[in-house]
Amino acid sequence: MIYLDNAATTKPKPEVVSAVMKCLTETWGNPSSLHRMGQDAKAIVGDARKAVADLIGAKPNEIIFTSGACESNSLAICGLLNKDSYTLITTNIEHKSIMNIADDWFILHKIDVDKNGFIDIIRLEQALQITKYNTPLVSIQYANNEIGTIQDMKRIIEMVHKYGGILHTDATQIIPDRKIDVSGIDMMSFSGQKLGAPKGIGVLYVREGIELSPIIYGSQEKSRRGGTENVPYIAGLGEAVRHIEYPIGEVRDYFVQQVLAQIPDCYLVGATGKDRLKNNASVCFKGISSEMMVVMLDQKGICVSSGSACNAGMEVSHVLKAISMGDDAKSVVRFTFGDNTKAEADVVVEELVKICKKMRENS
C-alpha cells in the first residue's frame, strides 16, 4: 500500500506506540491522585507539556491538552466569545470547526481569499477598522489543509495587533511542516495525529494573560478543560514532538514534475515554492471526477483524498469554491506525502496516467 493522505492522519511512530503502551500497562494512574502511581502519571503529563511548549517557543503553563484540533479551535473561539464582547473575523477557507462556529455567530466578518488561497490583507484591515465597539477576534488558518497555501502570518500578526485584536490560528498543518514560533500569536491550535501521535489528542496554546471560559467544565488543565487527562495519548504526543522530522519536499516536487510532464490538462492548485506546505500536492485533472479517481487509486492500493477528510464527500469543498475554481473543483485530488520514496511516486504517476487516459476516453 502507498499512503499519500498524511494531511488527514499519519501513522503513529514506533516511539509513540511504545510510550502509549507503557502508560496503558505500567503508568496507568490518575494524574490527580496523590499516591505514587498518580504522581508518576502527572510527571509524564508535565514532561509532555514541556516538550510541546519547547517545540513552539511557549511556556508550559500556556499549553492546554485537548482531544484534538477541533476541540482546540472551539475552546479558543467559544471560550472568548462566551466571555466578553468580541467581533469574530475569519476567512472563507477555514477548517469546518471554525466555519461552523462562524455560521452561528451574529457579529462576524468573513474575508475572501485569492485564487491561490491567500488572504486579502486590505480586506482584513477594513474589517478591523469597522470593528468599533467590540474587540476583534481574528481566526486565520496558518496553512490550508486542502491546497497547502501558507499565509503570511507575520503581516497578519502586525495587522491584527495594530487594531488591538486577538489572533488565533489553526496551525495543524504547519506544525509538521516546519519550525514555527508562537511569538505574536495569541492562541494556536494543532492536532497530534498529524505528527505521528494518536488520534484523539490535541493542543491549544493560550498566551499568558488571556482568560477563556471552558466549554468542558472540570478542575483539570487549571479549570480550562475538564476531564481526567488522557495520559497515554499525552505521552504519545510528547514522544512525537521530541522525534519530529520536518520534510524537505524532494519527493513531492519530483511527483508534481512527473504528473505535469506526463498527464495533459492538469495543474497544481494553490501556492507554490516556500508559500506551500512541503508535503502537499493538490492537482486538478480537468474533466475527471476526483471521487472516481480516489476510488480507482484505492483499488490499486494507493490512498489519496479528494479534499479534507473533514469535508470529503459528494459536495464540492468550500475551500475550492472560495478560490473560484468552477467546475474544476470537482476534479481536484490531494496527495500529501510522508516518508514516501521516488519509486512509490513513480508507481502512483504510472497509475494516474492509466486512469486519466481511460476516463477521458470513456467520457
Describe these PLM feature segments.
Residues 1-363:
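Pyridoxal 5′-phosphate
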